């Protein structure tokens, strides 16, 4: 006969085991999402082989912020200008600054490397997965919600930009969490959720400006969910007012330094006419490439089921939220002159939600969620295995060569398209923080971001260019072969380098899997004794209509 105490102990053991099982079920989705983030990091470029030209700039911006905090200079503006003169690929004020705060923190722990920068992006990629899981969980089962997270994380475009040091994924993560808090406010009517939504959406804005489109679908969802009660809810008015005030610094930064971003919203030469059919079909035609056929097909089925009233959980304001989020995003990004597949990503999380909810509600109970999970896992596995990230290889090797070849406090002239790759490569060399890079295009040309926005030439003669290089005390010239040879100034620079004052010291081929024009570089060394006569340098900054100048190292 079993004693009462033994039976009680056995029952407590069963209850404890059941409690641990429930905890494991709750934690399992988060563990799976973390594993997905780890798989993405493991398949990311990590050795200085940035493919997208802006990626090393975003990495350098984080290094700048880390160095600024470490230095705590008495004159931060002068210090920042001096930093730009040494590492002239900075773009920190041209973008919102929030991502760089996190990146600088990771750099402080792991060191300034591409791995640390990429790990920061993957952190947000993982948080994006958490966010879409929590959002979908409001309307679907736990397996289906995890399936939605894996579907979104496995979308080819999302996985691609999750493996580049860019702002798109961090902005999406903040946005999804902000919309999740907003949805909780509508569902549970708690003021703290509304305040949290405003804070998270402001964080998205301070990561990337183009998330601002979400205000329109959120307002329409609010009206659909609350009707005239919106006008009498003081919490809404206080929150909107506080959010508007919180957005003012971001607006100021955009207007002061973000003219290029504003130009992207205007018509640029070579872009599709804004109101043409080809412009408005640009993103729909690319949806299979951006989203992938499995998720796209399931999302279409989910939309049909939603319209037919077959997904009761999404009836009412959730329908307004999900459809408005995607439709308004599509309209917004189509209206912007510069159209790239990655821009539309911010509007695509509802497709994963619809796909998962369709399976969860249309298939037999419990089966649908498991099918959604299987689809999500399969999509992510396929993308990671068969959608490799493009790379450009060779710039880190050139930076290492330069670091090993120049004397203390050396000055290096760089002439090429991917200056960010080279400059960040030098910044990762903590043992050579004394080297200054000077960009030839900043000396000889006047160009804002890219050539199609207009190019001005300094009109120096060949002799003047040679004298400029000599007076600056350039120790090495890193020159992309045949770089912008259609411009007179660049042809004159090439002629100077092929003359008697310089000799080739090394040659590097640029490899990788991304199509590019930068095929090879030649590194030149002066044949004369180098003397640093010029102590100061002033550069035009047409991107914001000003100048940056100061003492050279």
Residue ranges and their predicted role:
Residues 137-143, 176-194, 204, 305-312, ...:
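Membrane-interface transmembrane helices that cradle and orient dolichyl/undecaprenyl
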Residues 157-170, 340-341:
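Short acidic/glycine- and proline-prone juxtamembrane loop motifs at membrane-interface regions
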């Amino acid at each position: 006969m079993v004693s009462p105490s033994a039976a009680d102990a056995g029952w407590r053991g069963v209850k404890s085991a059941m409690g641990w099982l429930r905890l494991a079920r709750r934690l399992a989705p988060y563990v799976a999402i973390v594993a997905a983030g780890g798989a993405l990091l493991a398949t990311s470029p990590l050795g200085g082989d940035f493919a997208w030209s802006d990626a090393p700039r975003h990495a350098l911006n984080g290094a700048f912020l880390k160095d600024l905090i470490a230095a705590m200079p008495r004159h931060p503006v002068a210090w920042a200008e001096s930093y730009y003169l040494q590492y002239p690929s900075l773009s920190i004020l041209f973008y919102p600054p929030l991502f760089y705060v996190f990146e600088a923190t990771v750099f402080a722990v792991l060191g300034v490397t591409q791995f640390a920068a990429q790990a920061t992006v993957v952190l947000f990629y993982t948080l994006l997965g958490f966010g879409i899981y929590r959002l979908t969980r409001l309307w679907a089962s736990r397996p289906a919600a995890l399936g939605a997270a894996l579907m979104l994380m496995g979308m080819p475009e999302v996985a691609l930009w999750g493996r580049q040091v860019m702002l798109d994924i961090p902005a999406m993560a903040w946005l999804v969490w902000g919309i999740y808090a907003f949805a909780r406010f509508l569902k549970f009517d708690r003021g703290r959720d509304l305040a949290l939504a405003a804070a998270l959406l402001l964080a998205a804005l301070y990561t990337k400006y183009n998330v601002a489109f979400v205000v329109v679908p959120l307002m329409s969802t609010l009206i659909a969910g609350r009707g005239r009660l919106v006008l009498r809810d003081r919490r809404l008015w206080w929150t909107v007012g506080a959010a508007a005030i919180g957005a003012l610094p971001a607006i100021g930064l955009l207007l002061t330094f973000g003219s290029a971003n504003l130009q992207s919203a205007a018509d640029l030469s070579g872009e599709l006419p804004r109101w043409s059919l080809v412009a408005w079909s640009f993103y729909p035609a690319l949806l299979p490439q951006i989203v992938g056929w499995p998720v796209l097909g399931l999302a279409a089925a989910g939309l049909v089921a939603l319209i037919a009233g077959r997904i009761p959980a999404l009836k009412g304001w959730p329908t307004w939220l999900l459809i408005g989020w995607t439709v308004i995003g599509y309209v917004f990004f189509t209206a912007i002159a510069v159209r790239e597949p990655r821009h539309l990503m911010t509007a695509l999380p509802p497709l994963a939600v619809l796909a998962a909810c369709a399976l969860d509600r249309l298939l037999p109970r419990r089966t649908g969620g498991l099918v959604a999970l299987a689809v999500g896992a399969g999509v992510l596995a396929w993308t990671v295995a068969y959608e490799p990230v493009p790379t450009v290889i060779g710039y880190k090797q050139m930076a290492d060569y330069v670091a090993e070849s120049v004397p203390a406090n050396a000055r290096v002239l760089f002439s090429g398209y991917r200056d960010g790759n080279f400059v960040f490569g030098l910044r990762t060399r903590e043992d050579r923080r004394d080297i200054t890079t000077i960009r030839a295009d900043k000396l000889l040309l006047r160009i804002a971001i890219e050539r199609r926005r207009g190019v001005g030439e300094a009109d120096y003669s060949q002799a003047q260019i040679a004298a400029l290089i000599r007076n600056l005390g350039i120790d090495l010239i890193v020159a992309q072969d045949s770089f912008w040879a259609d411009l007179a100034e660049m042809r004159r620079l090439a002629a100077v380098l092929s003359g008697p004052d310089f000799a080739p010291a090394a040659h590097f081929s640029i490899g990788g899997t991304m199509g590019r024009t930068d095929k090879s570089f030649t590194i030149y060394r002066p044949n004369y004794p180098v003397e640093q006569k010029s102590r100061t340098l002033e550069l035009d900054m047409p991107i914001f209509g000003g100048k940056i100048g100061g003492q050279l190292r």
